[in-house]
Design a protein with these regions (language model features):
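Multi-pass membrane proteins that catalyze or facilitate reactions on polyprenyl-/lipid-phosphate substrates
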Residues: 1-238
Length: 238
């Protein structure tokens, strides 16, 4: 992987992580289209650079995270289903699903159709607070995103809207939920493969992290403005 390729992948990660379009699928397909070899480092790279996007969420929501401890409890509750499934299926995900373009394309297509159908016929809710039970259900929806091609953001958004939450409430909760989810995925992957990283690999990771942080700041602000004026149908079509 070159410096330029690391910048491109970091930009894609940050910009797409919080949009309902599956950042993982974009990264996997981008590595193939850029001709990047499917090494263990590259597989870890597309996971680890998510930490840059995590930092962007923490930075933008730092005051709210400090002032609303209940929000943390709801996010941790929602994180549990993904943690359990991700841990149990880690080897399957890394060894097979990440390499299957068919799985990715099918998941992208199905996810897009669900988003379009749901947005077209579902009536928007008004609820702005999330109960522990609702958080757990949203977490169950997010667990589907362990499959490459299934958008974590789309899964949580559809789950939240189905429970009657307002668009902004579930979108912002999806951002917050990303913190424990992506932090755990990043940390576990580093623990599994960090010892095999060469010095140059660590430099490329840093490049990807910084680029992902900057582009995530842009992506989050863009998405929040967009949902005030537009539906999610455009993302489903995309």
């Amino acid at each position: 992987m070159t410096f330029f390729q690391a910048v491109i992948l970091g930009f894609i990660e940050g910009l797409t992580e919080f949009l309902p379009v599956s950042s993982t699928a974009h990264l996997i397909l981008a590595t193939k289209w850029l001709g990047i070899a499917e090494t263990d480092f590259v597989k870890s790279f597309v996971v680890v650079i998510q930490f840059g996007a995590i930092l962007a969420v923490i930075w933008l929501y730092r005051k709210r995270l400090w002032q609303e401890p209940a929000l943390w409890r709801r996010a941790l509750t929602a994180f549990l289903p993904t943690a359990i499934i991700g841990f149990l299926l880690y080897k399957l995900i890394k060894g097979f699903l990440f390499e299957s373009e068919l799985v990715i394309l099918l998941a992208l297509t199905l996810g897009g159709l669900i988003l379009i159908v749901f947005e077209r016929w579902h009536r928007a809710g008004e609820q702005n607070t999330i109960s522990a039970k609702q958080a757990l259900i949203i977490g169950g929806a997010q667990a589907l995103a362990v499959i490459p091609g299934v958008s974590r953001a789309a899964a949580t958004i559809v789950g939240g809207l189905a429970l009657g939450l307002s668009r902004r409430a579930i979108v912002e909760f999806s951002f917050i939920l990303a913190i424990p989810t992506m932090l755990a995925a990043t940390s576990y992957d580093l623990w599994q493969s960090g010892a095999s990283f060469a010095p140059d690999d660590w430099f490329l990771l840093l490049v990807g992290l910084i680029t992902a942080f900057i582009s995530a700041l842009i992506g989050i602000k863009f998405f929040l403005r967009l949902i005030e004026r537009r539906s999610f149908i455009a993302f489903g079509l995309y």
